[in-house]
Regions:
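Glycine-rich phosphate/pyrophosphate-handling loop used in enzymes and phosphotransfer proteins
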Residues: 1-296
Length: 296
């Protein structure tokens, strides 16, 4: 008996059938993967029920929801516009944030992205009068760009992803259809790292080198900042970022998105270069803000 007699005709399988087969295979593989490597709570490591669901156990999820129950405006330590966050960087929040950033728990992105989306919603509501100002919006009326904070090439290589980019995408997805504006995340393959020489001598875009990681990129050799003081962070960030495609943001309304706001040095530099490129920065949104004398 040949394959056609058994009811299988490879030449006649429709795209719809192939799609259903692929979906079934993906679900089957996901189920097998979960059987071999059961899911656990990202915060307390307790085993989670089989099947899809939050990346936190019921108790930790309740604590997370309490921590992010109400958005708030914070006073940044740098010259940045209005900043809206969903929580303070304490309690359960650091464990969730670091789980997503450093432990590969990208299954936490939906929870964090939802928190970020609520911040974006509040900021947009506060600036809703700007959407009717054609002189500001021009040809791109009723569209707001979510600009994720950049990750260094070394951190992207280590993690395999850029945290703020994942969160901005998730926030945009959750807000789709709920707002009078369409939100989109700027493509992430058009800006690289500014060379040290271009920072020192004001080099042109042609001097830019390094890995393409997002609309904005940190200067090469930037390294980690978390051990630096607020003043040191500000000095280190000045001139570190470049918008390499100014035409993509000129005359556009932008919101800067990040996972955690510490001193505001990164946000301040993003505001500077985006404004120089001609964009209108409405503000900064983040999942959490770090209290003074604390560091993520």
């Amino acid at each position: 008996m040949n394959v056609q007699q058994r009811g299988v005709s490879f030449g006649r399988v429709s795209g719809r059938k192939l799609g259903r087969s692929a979906d079934w295979a993906a679900r089957a593989w996901g189920s097998l993967d979960e059987l071999l490597l059961p899911r656990s709570c990202s915060c307390c490591s307790v085993a989670l029920p089989y099947g899809s669901g939050p990346a936190l156990c019921a108790e930790c999820l309740m604590r997370w929801k309490r921590a992010c129950a109400k958005t708030e405006r914070v006073d940044p330590m740098q010259d940045v516009p209005e900043t809206v966050v969903a929580s303070r960087y304490d309690g359960i929040v650091p464990r969730v944030v670091l789980g997503m950033k450093n432990a590969g728990r990208t299954d936490l992105v939906p929870l964090m992205g939802d928190a970020l989306a609520r911040c974006v919603f509040e900021l947009l509501r506060a600036h809703r009068e700007d959407f009717g100002r054609s002189s500001v919006l021009g040809a791109t009326e009723r569209e707001v760009l979510l600009i994720p904070a950049p990750s260094s090439s070394s951190s992207v290589s280590r993690r395999g992803y850029a945290p703020a980019t994942l969160l901005a995408r998730e926030a945009a997805r959750r807000l789709k259809g709920r707002l009078p504006t369409s939100l989109r995340v700027m493509p992430l393959d058009i800006v690289g790292y500014a060379s040290a020489s271009s920072r020192n001598d004001g080099g042109s875009i042609g001097d830019v080198a390094g890995t393409l990681t997002g609309l904005l990129g940190g200067a090469s050799g930037g390294g980690e900042q978390k051990t630096l003081s607020a003043v040191a962070r500000s000095e280190r960030m000045h001139g570190a970022l470049r918008v390499l495609e100014p035409a993509l943001v000129a005359g556009r309304l932008c919101i800067i998105c990040d996972d955690v706001v510490t001193t505001g040095a990164t946000a301040a530099e993003m505001v500077r270069v985006l404004r120089e490129a001609g964009s209108v920065v409405l503000g900064v949104c983040a999942v959490a803000s770090v209290p003074k004398k604390a560091s993520p």
